[in-house]
Amino acid sequence: MTQYTLKQAGSLLQSKQISAVELASAYLAAIAEKNPALNGYITIDQDKTLAEARAADERIAQGNASALTGVPVAYKDIFCQTGWRSACASKMLDNFIFPYTATVVQNLLDEGMVTLGRTNMDEFAMGSTNENSFYGAAKNPWNPEHVPGGSSGGSAAVVAARLAPAALGSDTGGSIRQPASHCGITGIKPTYGTVSRFGMVAYASSFDQAGPMAQTAEDCAILLNAMAGFDPKDSTSFEREKEDYTRDLDKPLKGVKIGLPKEYFSEGNSTDVQTALQNTIDLLKAQGAELVEVSLPQTKLSIPAYYVLASAEAGTNLSRYDGVRYGHRAAQFGDLEEMYGKTRAEGFGSEVKRRIMIGTYVLSHGYYDAYYLKAQKLRRLVADDFQTAFARCDLILAPTAPSAAPKIGADTSPVETYLSDIYTIAVNLAGLPALTLPAGFSGGGLPVGVQLVGNYFAEAKILGAAHQIQLNSDWHGKRPE
C-alpha cells in the first residue's frame, strides 16, 4: 500500500477502495520498521496522524473531499504546525512546540492531507549532506553508507524509501533539488514568492522557498496546486491569479527549445552525471525538442556571492535565538551577556556557527562594500545571464550536482562541500523555478538527477516537460530494495 504515487493514493481514497486510516496505518507501520535505520523522520506522533486520517475518512464519506483528502504527507522539520515539534534539527529548538501553523502546511491541512511527521534536515537548513543535524545524519535509502543530500535530506529519503508518498522541502541554495537527485525522486523549487514563507523558519529570507518532493512530476504539480498562492502574512508573496500547474502535463515537447549552458557541461562532472545528461538529451531529441547552446558566464561567481548574501541574512535571522523567550538556554551563567554567549555556543552546531560568523563579518564596518554590496551586484548579473539565455530558449537543462551522493563522513572541507551546489545556487540567486528529476544511476547504483530551469512563473511548463520525459522513461519508477 505504501508504493502508490500521490495521485494513485488520492484516486483510491476517492473511490473508497482504501480508507485514509488504512493508508496512514500502513505508512506508520513501514516507518516503525525502516526509520530506525534510515533516520529520515525525527518526529512521529501516531495518535495525531490517525486522528487526521479519521477526519479525512469522515470528509470523504460526506462527499466533501478534495483530490488530496486522506493522502499522507511528510514535512521538513522547518515548517511550523500547531502542537507539533519543529526543531529545525537543532539543539536550539529541541522539544519546542510551535503555537501556530505555517500557511503552506495549513493549505494542505485544508485539503485534508494527513501529517505523517517531521523529517530530518541539516540544522536550520544549512548544509548539503544532512550530516549537520542534531539528531544524527539521515541515510540514503539506496545505500545507507551514503548521504541523502541536503538540506531536505530527510524529506528526499522518506519519499524514496516509500515512507511517504510526498514531502515538503525548502530550497535556499538547492536544498530540494540536490537531495531529490541523490535519492532518485522529483522535486521542484518554485519561483521565489510563489509559496508562502510564513511559518517556515527563516535561514536566508531573500532565497528561501518551499516546494514539493514526490515520485513524479505529476505528483509535484498536483501538490503545488494546493501549496501555492498569495499570502498577506508573507511580505514577499506574489499576488497573482491562481494557476493550474497540471495544465501543461499533456503538452508534447515537439518544438520546445531546450538551452544547454556550455559552462554546465564541463569536465568537472562525473561520468555518471554526463551519462544522465546524455540520457535526457536523447529523450528530448526523440520527442522533437530543439537543443540550443546558451551561456551562463557568471555561474562560477554564484557560490561566493551566495555564501556572502545567505550568511549575512542567516546571521541576522538567527540573532533571535538568545535563550530569553524560547528555545535552549544555558543552565549556568553569571550575567545576561554570558547567558547569550553560552546559550548560542551550546545551542548551535558548527556549520551554523560558521555561517553566522561569515555573515557578521561581511556586514561589519569596512567590509560591507567589499563583500555584501559586491555580492548583491553579482546577484543581478547572474539573473541577467538567465534572461539573456531565455531569449533563446524555453527551458534550460543542467546537472543538479557534479556527482552522485558522497559517503557519510567523507573527508571534505567546507569549501568542497559548498562547491557541490555549483549548479543549483545560481537559480536561487535569480529567484527562478527549477525541477530535478531522476535520469540514471551511477556505477555504484546511486541515483543521478538532472534539472530543468524555467523563467519566472514557468512552473507549469517545467512540470509539463518533466512529465513528458517521465512518460518515456522509468528512472522515477525505480525504488531501493
Curated annotation (Swiss-Prot):
Its EC number is 6.3.5.7. Signal peptide: none annotated. The active site is at K76, S151, S175. GO terms for cellular component: glutamyl-tRNA(Gln) amidotransferase complex. It comes from the Bacteria. Keywords: ATP-binding, Ligase, Nucleotide-binding, Protein biosynthesis. GO terms for biological process: translation. It catalyses: L-glutamyl-tRNA(Gln) + L-glutamine + ATP + H2O = L-glutaminyl-tRNA(Gln) + L-glutamate + ADP + phosphate + H(+). Allows the formation of correctly charged Gln-tRNA(Gln) through the transamidation of misacylated Glu-tRNA(Gln) in organisms which lack glutaminyl-tRNA synthetase. The reaction takes place in the presence of glutamine and ATP through an activated gamma-phospho-Glu-tRNA(Gln). Heterotrimer of A, B and C subunits. PANTHER family: GLUTAMYL-TRNA(GLN) AMIDOTRANSFERASE SUBUNIT A, TRANSAMIDASE. NCBIfam families: gatA. This is Glutamyl-tRNA(Gln) amidotransferase subunit A.
